[in-house]
Swiss-Prot record:
Changing K233A: Severe loss of binding to a HSP90 C-terminus peptide (MEEVD). TPR repeats lie at residues 144-177, 194-227, 228-261. Homodimer. Interacts (via TPR repeats) with HSP90 (probably via MEEVD motif). GO terms for molecular function: FK506 binding; peptidyl-prolyl cis-trans isomerase activity; protein dimerization activity. Changing N152A: Severe loss of binding to a HSP90 C-terminus peptide (MEEVD). The PPIase FKBP-type domain contributes to the chaperone activity. Required for the inhibition of calcineurin phosphatase activity. Residues 37-126 form the PPIase FKBP-type domain. Its EC number is 5.2.1.8. Has peptidylprolyl isomerase (PPIase) and co-chaperone activities. Assists protein folding by catalyzing the peptidyl conversion of cis and trans rotamers of the prolyl amide bond of protein substrates. Inhibits calcineurin phosphatase activity in vitro. Plays an essential role in merozoite egress from host erythrocytes. This is Peptidyl-prolyl cis-trans isomerase FKBP35. The gene is FKBP35. It holds the Pfam family FKBP_C.
Length: 304
């Protein structure tokens, strides 16, 4: 932790309970000061003033800490301090126990009535994400569409895991839509759901996560039982997961609906060949097991 030298010191409360020493000034301008409700991202080290012992550090975890400002998610002294900071500012803040963990403390590492010292660096902040429950139906559809398009951009760059996150995020907007009665919005919702689930099936097939590919392709077929792309992706996932009979059925139906699609036809032929090989192997393994009579046959001339 940085040693206190001749730095600017600011009393953030009238009683001196929260005192901030600025170690590195932040960016100028009002736009660089976080507001109530913003999601802030910080790095910090916390120690006890009495012993100098470090009890917590985001650096040790190598992961910055995020919280929503003035929402009761952290101790009061933190809300007061970080509210006064600017982006890229680094400070040392002294927090009396009434603004920290009080006379109860916090576990074994922070005894009651402890004065706390934190070195905090404000890395960034942004407006908190709006709750899905606060969106109008129109906003849900538009947001889901926009996020799906972001997923498509990741997919084009072959950033498959990033694309998966976006497609799933888009679908989250439709978790509670049972009471929708606007047919235009329902049709748009259906198209986005089909598109996202198809894309997720493709992504999971690429990642060889066949159970998840099966799940998302099946969701499309619940909406549109003759969706050729879903049948194809489901067939491919079933085939590579070892469900050859199901795969053959999926791919046969897809080929029947779209007989000119070479990818479907080639996958169907591959599946048929895999099925033949599997049956041949089964025959070699089990074919002669029972053709010599019962496993335990009495000897003809056994003694009574």
């Amino acid at each position: 932790m940085t040693t206190e030298q001749e730095f600017e010191k600011v009393e953030l409360t009238a009683d001196g309970g929260v005192i901030k020493t600025i170690l590195k000034k932040g960016d100028e301008g009002e736009e660089n000061i976080p507001k109530k409700g913003n999601e802030v991202t910080v790095h910090y080290v916390g120690k006890l003033e009495s012993t100098g012992k470090v009890f917590d550090s985001s650096f040790d975890r190598n992961v910055p800490f995020k919280f929503h400002l003035e929402q009761g998610e952290v101790i009061k002294g933190w809300d007061i301090c970080v509210s006064s900071m600017r982006k890229n500012e680094k400070c040392l803040v002294r927090i009396e126990s009434m603004y920290g963990y009080g006379d109860e403390g916090c576990g074994e590492s922070i005894p009651g009535n402890s004065v706390l010292l934190f070195e905090i660096e404000l890395l960034s902040f942004r407006e908190a994400k709006k709750s899905i429950y606060d969106y109008t139906d129109e906003e849900k559809v538009q947001s889901a569409f926009d996020i799906k398009e972001e997923g498509n951009e990741f997919f084009k760059k072959n950033e498959i895991n990033e694309a998966i996150v976006k497609y799933k995020e888009a679908l989250d907007f439709f978790i509670h839509t049972e009471e929708w009665d606007d047919q235009i919005l329902l049709d748009k919702k259906k198209n986005i759901e089909i598109s996202c689930n198809l894309n997720l099936a493709t992504c999971y097939n690429k990642n060889k996560d066949y159970p998840k590919a099966i799940d998302h392709a099946s969701k499309v077929l619940k909406i549109d039982k003759n969706n050729v792309k879903a049948l194809y992706k489901l067939g491919v996932a079933n085939m590579y997961f070892g469900f050859l009979e199901e795969a053959k059925e999926n791919l046969y139906k897809a080929a029947s609906l779209n007989p000119n699609n070479l990818d479907i036809r080639n996958s169907y032929e591959l599946c048929v060949n895999k099925l033949k090989e599997a049956r041949k192997k089964d025959k070699l393994t089990f074919g002669g097991m029972f053709d010599k009579g019962p496993l335990y046959e009495e000897k003809k001339n056994s003694a009574n």
